[in-house]
């Protein structure tokens, strides 16, 4: 910047509370931030984001970005801020007091935080409202119009002492004009008017630059007796940038649309579905939304990754976000996507990868990538071209890495009115967004997904949605959200039952094609049975060997069925798989099941094995069952479960050569209580009504789903059905209302959009922690997660007997980091009853009290701080909130009401 600063050299920008001999003049922090903004634009920002920011040429964007960095803390040039920050720096205070007294009523300072003050000062100097609002929002939340409007008049004593107005206005003018001239402007009138969408992205970039420039590891403070020197620039910024070493944007290479290149990348030639996807994205004139509806196991993941390469290469995207329904599915696909990401990264220009969910730091594969895994050995280290960059490890920075694999929550949070949401928009705007299992979200989550799609459509972010079982109505909602409701009403693509089906947009046009399958289909026979009939069916089906899967809707039902089968079929091996196992136990079971009934499993491993599980079997396991029993569930999920039946080609025992699925049901006039609690009556009733005797796959997948979900096109179905429908629809409306209370505004309907400002943009933001925010995008009661350890009769604390050899851990001191990581992995989500509104406070209160009395020192461990420890006795039982809990290796966690507790 031009060396014209005079009076403002004495203003303080940053101090060190622990070392009063250091400070940073305000001008230096502004120069640091401006320099980082420039480098982010030149070297880190993908081309697609530059276009979305609305400037016709990069130099204009660069000038505005540098201006924002150089002026963002002008609100610190106020008496309220300077009087406060200089309390502990008498020498620097003395310099400033030679120019002006620092008298400021302490009780009023909160009314003018420096971000708000900065916006007010810029508006005073006729800066465009949108630019000023970015400064007001740079701490993560835009200001309210009311708060900004009365700042200089209502709280003038926060801006300058009585009689000192001209002195402080001179400060503002000097800073503003210096920054303007450095950026090539002569006056604020030359700054562009932006719309709120462009301002969201620039705010995200400014927050990022400010965080980097505020890190003393990159930008050290200087001795308090120094004022800094212009001669240090740009070398000071260059050193920091080199030390930070952010990865460059991903530059996808063209050519993957060629079948030979595809085969090199993935190890097999593209099938009909994959070829259709690649043709669509290779010929589209503009980025858009693409929805692929295709059967389980057809290679949708590879199709999506190849399409992402094509679109990134054509439209200048700098990364990929891959979102999945659960942590288990994200963990399951992470090694696969890591392998793909390695092919996209060069050793000299490594890309950053991020596993983004609440328990990512417990994922062994992810830890090994960081060199932190507890099982890491020199000869076992794999060479990867991607890296886990330190700067992206924070939750709010997660989406800024090049390749992000995580739960769909990371995308949904971009639609939540939450502080610093602009960082999520910045990260997503530069990526191809892939959402797997897009049918798997309820009405509440879909509200957030739709709002996120509206913003992604505005930014022209390519979006790929994958599903095997998508209702046509939902397909239409997704496309219309991306196009901001601009689609043609009642267009044929909205009701198509073709399958596999590809729907995509090219500008305003919606295109669609049914893909002729290039592999033979299969017929699955369906029967129904009741619970008492189950053992006989499995005895008959497994008479000559083979394996069976039983998928039910609740953990309690799974445990009950497993016990029934163990007693009725003692010659068969019955394994349980559900969500209420400890993390290590569940991982061990998953690995065992993948080895025994996965794609490459041998007959001798499969024979006489019955796996009983819950929805996690349909979501996270690539298993191949010889026969399937599933509890009645909504048709789309039932078809997902059938996708685990005869999944791969293999030789099967004679009674199992015909694919057969038995549907476990209670009868015509009732539903299982647990199933009803999970899914409600209406969709269960509709599925039962349209359940066929056989299904031809894949052709009949879509027609069956549309039958169950297309009730609007039917005549009323009688009093019982109408009552269930009304209850269902009322429930969905309530879910929508709850979600809409916390959504960010739509891109084009923000009530101040015509004023081109972010003010009032996020007034429904609540003070939510990261876990609370993640919970806000999922409906229902909060879940309670615990770490499970054992307390023996002598009071010593141990791992469970089969975990870490049952070794002891000191209770009176923080565990060493490696031990703390092992403890943190003993995670278990308690059953839903423990999170109910009438129960959860008591649960947490009892656990916290027990932890304070026995394990207070563990809270000093960074990995264990804030965790709740459930201590089991020597019989692996515990009492909690009026419940008796028991854990064992075979069944997981079971619970029942305490017999002596009459009041709960």
Segments (PLM) and residue ranges:
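Post-DEXD/H (motif II) to motif III coupling segment of the RecA-like Helicase ATP-binding lobe
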Residues: 426-432, 439-512
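C-terminal helicase lobe and adjacent C-terminal extensions/tails of nucleic-acid helicase motors
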Residues: 131, 475, 532, 536-539, ...
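Walker A/P-loop
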Residues: 286-308, 441, 467
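Conserved Walker A/P-loop ATP-binding site and its immediately adjacent core
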Residues: 318-342, 355-361, 470-474, 555
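A substrate-engagement module of RecA-like helicase motors
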Residues: 337-402, 408-412
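Conserved pre-motif I regulatory segment
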Residues: 256-293
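Accessory nucleic-acid engagement/destabilization modules that flank
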Residues: 2-254
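Conserved interdomain linker/interface between the two RecA-like ATPase lobes of SF2 helicase motors
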Residues: 486-558
């Amino acid at each position: 910047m031009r060396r014209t600063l005079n009076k403002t050299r004495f203003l303080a920008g940053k101090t060190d509370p622990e070392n009063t001999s250091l400070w940073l003049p305000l001008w230096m922090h502004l120069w640091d931030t401006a320099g980082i903004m420039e480098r982010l634009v030149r070297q880190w920002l993908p081309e697609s984001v530059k276009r979305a920011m609305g400037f016709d040429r990069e130099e204009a964007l660069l000038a505005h970005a540098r201006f924002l960095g150089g002026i963002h803390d002008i609100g610190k040039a106020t008496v309220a801020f300077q009087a406060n920050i200089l309390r502990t720096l008498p020498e620097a205070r003395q310099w400033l007091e030679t120019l002006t007294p620092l008298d400021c009523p302490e009780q009023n300072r909160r009314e003018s935080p420096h971000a708000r003050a900065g916006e007010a000062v810029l508006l005073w100097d006729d800066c465009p409202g949108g630019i000023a609002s970015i400064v007001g929002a740079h701490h993560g939340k835009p200001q309210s119009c009311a708060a900004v409007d009365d700042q200089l008049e209502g709280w003038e004593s926060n801006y300058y002492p009585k009689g000192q107005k001209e002195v402080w206005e001179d400060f503002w003018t000097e800073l503003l004009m210096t920054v303007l001239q450095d950026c090539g402007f002569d006056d604020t009138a030359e700054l562009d008017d932006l719309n709120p969408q462009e301002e969201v992205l620039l705010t995200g970039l400014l927050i990022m630059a400010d965080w980097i420039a505020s890190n003393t590891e990159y930008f050290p403070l200087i001795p308090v007796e120094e004022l800094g020197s212009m001669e240090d620039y740009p070398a000071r910024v260059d050193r920091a940038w080199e030390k930070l070493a952010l990865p460059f944007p991903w530059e996808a290479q063209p050519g993957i649309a060629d079948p030979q290149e595809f085969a090199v990348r993935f190890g097999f030639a593209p099938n009909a579905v994959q070829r259709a996807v690649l043709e669509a994205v290779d010929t589209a004139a503009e980025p858009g939304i693409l929805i692929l509806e295709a059967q389980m196991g057809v290679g949708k993941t590879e199709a999506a990754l190849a399409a992402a390469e094509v679109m990134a290469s054509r439209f200048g995207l700098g990364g990929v976000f891959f979102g999945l329904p659960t942590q288990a599915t994200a963990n399951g696909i992470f090694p696969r996507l890591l392998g793909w990401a390695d092919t996209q990264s060069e050793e000299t220009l490594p890309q950053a990868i991020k596993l983004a969910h609440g328990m990512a730091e417990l994922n062994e594969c992810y830890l090994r990538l960081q060199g932190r895994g507890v099982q890491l050995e020199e000869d076992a280290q794999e060479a990867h071209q991607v890296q886990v960059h330190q700067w992206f490890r924070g939750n709010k920075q997660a989406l800024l890495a090049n390749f992000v694999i995580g739960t769909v929550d990371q995308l949904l949070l971009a639609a939540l009115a939450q502080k610093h949401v602009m960082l999520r928009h910045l990260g997503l705007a530069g990526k191809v967004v892939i959402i797997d299992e897009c049918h798997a979200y309820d009405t509440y989550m879909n509200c957030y997904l739709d709002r996120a799609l509206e913003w992604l459509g505005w930014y022209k972010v390519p979006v790929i949605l994958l599903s095997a079982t998508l209702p046509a109505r939902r397909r239409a909602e997704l496309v219309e959200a991306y196009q901001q409701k601009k689609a043609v009403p009642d267009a044929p693509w909205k009701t198509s039952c073709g399958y596999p089906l590809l729907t995509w947009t090219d500008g305003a046009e919606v295109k669609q094609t049914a893909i002729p399958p290039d592999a033979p289909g299969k017929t699955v026979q369906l029967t129904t049975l009741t619970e008492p009939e189950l053992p006989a069916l499995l005895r008959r089906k497994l008479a000559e060997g083979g394996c069976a899967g039983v998928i039910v809707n609740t953990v309690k039902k799974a445990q009950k069925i497993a016990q029934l089968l163990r007693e009725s079929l003692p010659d068969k091996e019955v394994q349980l798989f559900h969500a209420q196992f400890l993390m290590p136990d569940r991982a061990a079971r998953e690995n065992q099941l993948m080895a025994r009934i996965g794609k490459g499993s041998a007959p001798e491993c499969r024979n006489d094995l019955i796996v009983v599980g819950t929805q996690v079997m349909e979501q996270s396991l690539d298993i191949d069952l010889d026969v399937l029993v599933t509890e009645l569930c909504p048709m789309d999920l039932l078809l997902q479960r059938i996708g685990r039946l005869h999944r791969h080609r293999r030789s099967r025992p004679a009674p199992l050569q015909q694919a057969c699925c038995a549907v476990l049901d209670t009868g015509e006039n009732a539903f299982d209580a647990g199933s009803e609690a999970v899914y409600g009556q209406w969709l269960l009733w509709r599925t039962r009504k349209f359940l066929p005797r056989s299904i031809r796959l894949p052709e009949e997948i879509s027609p069956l789903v549309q039958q169950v979900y297309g009730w609007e096109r039917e005549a009323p179905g009688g009093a019982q059905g109408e009552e269930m429908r009304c209850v269902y629809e009322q429930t969905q409306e309530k879910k929508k209302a709850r979600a809409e209370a916390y959504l960010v505004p739509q891109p084009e309907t923000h009530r101040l959009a015509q004023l081109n400002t972010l003010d009032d943009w996020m007034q429904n933001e609540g003070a939510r922690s990261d876990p609370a925010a993640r919970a806000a995008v999922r409906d229902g009661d909060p879940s309670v997660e615990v770490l499970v350890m054992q307390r023996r009769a002598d009071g010593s604390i141990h791992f469970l007997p089969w975990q870490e050899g049952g070794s002891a851990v000191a209770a009176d001191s923080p565990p060493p980091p490696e031990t703390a990581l092992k403890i943190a992995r003993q995670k278990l989500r308690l059953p839903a009853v423990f999170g109910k509104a009438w129960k959860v406070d008591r649960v947490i209160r009892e656990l916290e009290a027990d932890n304070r009395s026995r394990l207070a020192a563990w809270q000093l461990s960074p990995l264990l701080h804030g965790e709740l420890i459930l201590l089991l006795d020597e019989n692996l039982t515990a009492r909690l909130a009026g419940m008796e809990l028991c854990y064992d290796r075979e069944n997981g966690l079971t619970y029942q009401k305490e017999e002596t507790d009459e009041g709960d």
